[in-house]
From Swiss-Prot:
The gene is ghrB. Belongs to the D-isomer specific 2-hydroxyacid dehydrogenase family. GhrB subfamily. This is Glyoxylate/hydroxypyruvate reductase B. It is found in: Cytoplasm. It comes from Escherichia coli O9:H4 (strain HS). Its EC number is 1.1.1.79, 1.1.1.81.
Length: 324
């Protein structure tokens, strides 16, 4: 008899078929208490869980006594109670490598669109505002040869540094938990403390996961240390930034502009002051959102769940010691 798994995110037909070759698959719309209650017998028997964008906490795990592995279609896993999973010896799988290049593309797009005011001036053209040769009020700022500060030199940080160094001749500063020898050798990146990075960078790109240590890592104190001409980019996790402090910094002119793919609350409230600022490019968490990459992430998540329930946890496992 095949193990039972719960799928709470739609999959392409071929990936669903692959999953069904290994498991009895039960599809649900979400992991809300109502859904769990209505499908209590299914949740009680499930050994695997696959999906994204839902909280997996201790309360849910209490309803799933046979759960052995959960696989998320994402690199981030701050919506999972890792301690609760680990205490119950449940493996947590994620997709850390598939989206690297695509998210780096998004970061570079935010750098370019904020510096060159692409969204703002495009809207002016659409509104009929281009009636004569453009003047300084349409101008942006250069990207090439400007200093890029990267906070978080992981896979995505490395991919961004590659684009910036080779494509735009940008000097690279970075701050991370440890020195990154490859970044220093390939991109001539310079490690520095966060204060130095903030003071010297023309673009500050934040690429950090959300943890207890990184929550509101960026606040009023950090924005005050940045150049008034600097542009802030966040494509990591929204709550790493104190959004009210960011809004205040933009309103006071402490920083020049911001390109944001993530927010403290998602979706972003329609009455957020960020949406009325011409110098803010706000996009709806599209970091990995291409057809190719989202398919690759889903395929990886399917393979991860198959591997995990077969006892193979050599890669993509957040808590591999559970399998020991």
């Amino acid at each position: 008899m095949k193990p039972s798994v719960i799928l709470y995110k739609a999959l392409p037909d071929d990936l669903l078929q692959r999953l069904q070759e290994h498991f009895t698959v039960h599809q649900v719309a979400n992991l809300s208490p109502q859904t769990v209650e209505q499908n209590a017998a299914i949740f009680a028997e499930a050994e695997g869980l696959l999906g994204s964008n839902e909280n997996v906490d201790a309360a849910l795990l209490e309803k799933m006594p046979k759960l052995r592995a959960t696989s998320t279609i994402s690199v981030g896993y701050d919506n999972f109670d890792v301690d609760a999973l680990t205490a119950r010896k449940i493996l947590l799988m994620h997709t850390p490598t598939v989206l690297t290049e695509t998210v780096a593309d998004t970061l570079m797009a935010l750098v370019l669109s904020t510096a060159r005011r692409v969204v703002e001036v495009a809207e002016r053209v659409k509104a009929g505002g281009w009636t004569a040769s453009i003047g300084p009020d349409w101008y942006g700022t250069d990207v090439h040869h400007k200093t890029l500060g990267i906070v978080g030199m992981g896979r995505i940080g490395m991919a961004l540094a590659q684009r910036a160094h080779f494509g735009f001749n940008m000097p690279i500063l970075y701050n991370a938990r440890r020195h990154h020898k490859e970044a220093e050798e390939r991109f001539n990146a310079r490690y520095c403390d966060l204060d130095t990075l903030l003071q010297e960078s023309d673009f500050v790109c934040l690429i950090l996961p959300l943890t207890d240590e990184t929550h509101h890592l960026f606040g009023a104190e950090q924005f005050a240390k940045m150049k008034s001409s600097a542009i802030f980019i966040n494509a990591g996790r929204g709550p790493v930034v104190d959004e009210n402090a960011l809004i205040a910094a933009l309103q006071k002119g402490e920083i020049h502009a911001a390109g944001l793919d993530v927010f403290e609350q998602e979706p972003l409230s329609v009455d957020s002051p960020l949406l009325s600022m011409a110098n803010v490019v706000a996009v709806p968490h599209i970091g990995s959102a291409t057809h190719e990459t989202r398919y690759g992430m889903a395929a990886c998540a399917v393979d991860n769940l198959i591997d995990a329930l077969q006892g193979k946890v050599e890669k993509n496992c957040v808590n591999p010691h559970v399998a020991d």
